[in-house]
Amino acid sequence: MSSVTLRNVSKAYGETIISKNINLEIQEGEF
């Protein structure tokens, strides 16, 4: 199977920061 890992993800629209340094880890079998 597989897993998903996102580290230090940020999103901004222009100068407006929506999210900053988000981490997400989904282990095998959790999705």
Curated annotation (Swiss-Prot):
Write the Enzyme Commission number(s) for this entry: 7.5.2.1
InterPro entries recorded: P-loop_NTPase (IPR027417)
Instruction: Tell me where it resides.
Output: Cell inner membrane
Q: Which GO terms describe its molecular function?
A: ABC-type maltose transporter activity; ATP binding
Topological relation to the membrane, as annotated = Peripheral membrane protein
Family stated for the protein in its record: Belongs to the ABC transporter superfamily. Maltooligosaccharide importer (TC 3.A.1.1.1) family.
Q: What is this protein called?
A: Maltose/maltodextrin import ATP-binding protein MalK
Organism of origin is Photorhabdus luminescens
The encoding gene: malK
